[in-house]
Amino acid sequence: MAWCLVFMVFLIYCLISTVGLPVAPADEAAMQLGGVGGGRLSVEPSDVMEASLDFGRLTSAEPLAVFHPRGAGDVAALVKAAYGSASGIRVSARGHGHSISGQAQAAGGVVVDMSHGWRAEAAERTLPVYSPALGGHYIDVWGGELWIDVLNWTLAHGGLAPRSWTDYLYLSVGGTLSNAGISGQAFHHGPQISNVYELDVVTGKGEVVTCSESNNPDLFFGALGGLGQLGIITRARIALEPAPHRVRWIRALYSNFTEFTADQERLISLQHGGRRFDYVEGFVVAAEGLINNWRSSFFSPQNPVKLSSLKHHSGVLYCLEVTKNYDDSTAVTVDQDVEALLGELNFIPGTVFTTDLPYVDFLDRVHKAELKLRGKGMWEVPHPWLNLFVPASRIADFDRGVFRGVLGSRTAGGPILIYPMNRHKWDPRSSVVTPEEDVFYLVAFLRSAVPGSTDPAQSLEALERQNREILEFCDEAGIGAKQYLPNHKAQREWEAHFGARWARFARLKAEFDPRAMLATGQGIFDSPPLLAES
């Protein structure tokens, strides 16, 4: 093992030296990159082990080394060295390690740890800027910055906040922008990738390219939702808005799926400027369960809402989840607005549950649940998550085939989200693949396997088997679903995933990462694509 380590360090030394970057030993298992801001290359077993795992805990792949950059120049120098090497060493960016199936891993390559970059220090962060041309504020952030830190910073400097969110805020900016970034605000603001003005991207050639809708648009839109295939996002210019002070958070139960989805779709169709909710989600609940789930602490632990009390509604239930934002100027009308909006919905009478909390507490709700699960040793367990975009025209078939078919009452293991989005809020020039209907649903099976559980339904094997059954049903029934945070095993499956957009994606890959070195953990390209394929 020792000789492998020596060879590995020597190999990386040679790679870096070929582009003129001086290297000096730091300790027995790390080296310092000089002249580019202090990036550090580590082969410490603890660093390598951490980079070989992710949140999913489903796969493991050890890199040769982990690189800790101080800025985009460091990232570019490393990628340029790898690009110029004889074999084209694999390079993957890692934010907070929240991938599910090894997407940010780099077996036998180098993982770039983006979590401690040059904007991660408060003294080096930029302040929000008002742009008359854009008609609003924005902020430039490091690609490895966590969204929770962006939120806290912008709130403290102008009472501002990003417009679009994910449910969990301890994710990196570059990570979510490489996928899409969605939550209950997406029906109105679009995903996070629709709320970005500009990027700096380190391409697979080691070049730092600034791009936007009008400047290098192919790279800009290709990188947004591009699964890290075209480059590493080192800077993002994020749209901001004035942050509300408080949130009225409401849940209501349905037993009729058609009424549930009709109400959801009506709510996301309401126009801005009129009376509407600011966030629309929902989830599936087994009749013997609780309306609470690990994603939030909606109710007091001393007073949970037991669904078994709904004696006349057996089987699968559906929970609508909405919020209304307000501040001092609108506090006097929030009750009236909520009452009017709820008055047009068809939930089960007597099943409306409401709470009120600060805006930040609502956005950070999942983290509070994370802390509880960590305390019980239930956070770092396998997470065989499955996220699907389902066209609205087939969501009723999906309900019959999956919620009432494959799953039945076996919904243990974690929440199952379901909520619609408006396709016109997604820019078709991005790399994200969605169903080609005006409205489509996210259906997210966010289950956790419980090691040592006496319930076989909560085992990893059982949950992965259910995932396969769900995907098989979608294929056999022609549902037309597309995976979000996709996980495919072969290039032909990726070609089917992208469909008519594959040729463009392969062309962009050949242009910006011609040696196919970046984000190989995604498993998209078996070999470097040829420009002729476009």
UniProtKB/Swiss-Prot annotation:
Glycoprotein in keyword set: yes
Gene Ontology MF terms: cytokinin dehydrogenase activity; FAD binding; oxidoreductase activity
Gene: CKX5
Domain of life: Eukaryota
Protein family membership: Belongs to the oxygen-dependent FAD-linked oxidoreductase family.
Enzyme superclass (EC): oxidoreductase
Residues with glycosylation annotation: N152, N256
UniProt keyword Ubl conjugation present: no
Binding of FAD, residues: A93, G95, G97, S99, Q103, D167, S172, S178, I182, I233, Y484, Q522
Entry's EC annotation: 1.5.99.12
Known cofactor(s): FAD
Tissues where the protein occurs: Expressed in inflorescence meristems.
Complex and partners: Monomer.
Record lineage: Eukaryota, Viridiplantae, Streptophyta, Embryophyta, Tracheophyta
Annotated Gene3D superfamilies: 3.30.465.10, FAD-linked oxidases, C-terminal domain (3.40.462.10), Uridine Diphospho-n-acetylenolpyruvylglucosamine Reductase, domain 2 (3.30.43.10)
Keywords, in A-Z order: FAD, Flavoprotein, Glycoprotein, Oxidoreductase, Secreted, Signal
Pfam families attached to this UniProt entry: Cytokin-bind, FAD_binding_4
UniProt cross-references to PROSITE patterns, sorted A to Z: FAD_PCMH, OX2_COVAL_FAD
Residue numbers bearing the Pros-8alpha-FAD histidine modification: H98
Name of the featured protein: Cytokinin dehydrogenase 5
Biological role stated in the UniProt entry: Catalyzes the oxidation of cytokinins, a family of N(6)-substituted adenine derivatives that are plant hormones, where the substituent is an isopentenyl group.
Domain FAD-binding PCMH-type as annotated: residue spans: 59-243
Organism: Oryza sativa subsp. japonica
One GO cellular component, as annotated: extracellular region
